[in-house]
Structure formats: C-alpha cells, structure tokens
C-alpha cells in the first residue's frame, strides 16, 4: 500500500467517524431495541493468504451457530427488518471504519474473503490478496448485483456454495486483478464516488 493511499484511508475514516458518530450510535440503538444483542457481527476474513482479522459489521441477521459461507437465498429468512434497510444502503458496513483505521482493510480493494475460500482457491487468492482488501472496489461495483441475483434462488448452503465457487469467485477475482493493474489514488477516488452515488436513494 502506498503512503498516499494510507493517508487517504486514515483521513477519510477519521472524518467519517467524527461526522457519522450520531448515525453510528443511532443505528446501534435501533438494532439493540428492535433485534436485541449482539449489535455487531464479527466475521473472520483474510487480509493476506496467511493472516486473518475480524471484520466488523452491524448485525443484519438472526444468529445461527451453524452459519457458514456466503449469504444466499438459503439465509434470506434470517435477515431482520432492520437488516434489510441496512443492507439496502450498505449501512451495515459502517463499523468497518474501525477496520480501516487499524489497517486491516482499505476503502478500495477486493472484498476480504472468508478463510474457507482462500483455502479452496489458494493460487487465485495469492494473486488477489497482493493488494489490501477494501470496503468497496471494482468487483463490488460491477458484480455485486449479479452475485445477489445468482445466489438468491439458492435454497441450501451447499447450493449457495456451489454457485458462489463456480460462478462468482472467478469473475470477481478477474475484476479484482483488473483493478490491481489500474489502481491509483485518482482511480480509488472515482470508485469511492461511484459507490456513494449508487447508494443515494433516488425515490
């Protein structure tokens, strides 16, 4: 990671934390009142093929001790009413500002994968994770809705896993590697702006 990229991460994360603290506290209170504890969902993700970290999110689902893999249609009935709202505008990812400050992730980069997928596709993720993972990125912007459409019909964890591994992992990795070739501070700012614009409610 370049110094300019790290300074952008730190400056923007601190600014958003200060300005957005009332929103963060309000959302935490809303989850606590409507859905109970825990307010946060902590998930192990990988920042390099060898090093994991705990990714912070606001909880959007009812807890399930047997939960594994990515979210597909098989988990749709566990999403809370508050969770639907948070996911629609990606507000569930606001706690990741803490991960950015810690240096676990950047604002822009490939989404940090679960350990299970790094172990299933070691050669692929050895390339993808040469760059620091991020909250948003080219693959997130270009493929997220397609991924949701592909996984929504899945009715079991095994089916979700099969579709994700066969259809989503290689396509997202291809986009992540395109980003790696194009990355620059200006390109990161363009991707951040595109992410914000996409999440603004227009109706």
Language model regions located:
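A short, structured surface patch at a secondary-structure boundary
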Residues: 74-138, 192
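Positions in alpha-helical segments
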Residues: 13, 41, 80-84, 116, ...
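A generic fold-level signal
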Residues: 35-38, 74, 100, 133, ...
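Intrinsically disordered, low-complexity boundary segments flanking structured domains
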Residues: 25-29, 43-44, 122-130, 159-166
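C-terminal terminal-structure detector
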Residues: 130-203
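Short, hydrophobic secondary-structure boundary micro-motifs
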Residues: 27, 41, 70, 108-110, ...
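A hydrophobic, helix-centered structural microdomain
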Residues: 1-64, 179-203
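Short, glycine-rich, amphipathic interfacial segments at transmembrane boundaries or analogous
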Residues: 41-78, 139-170
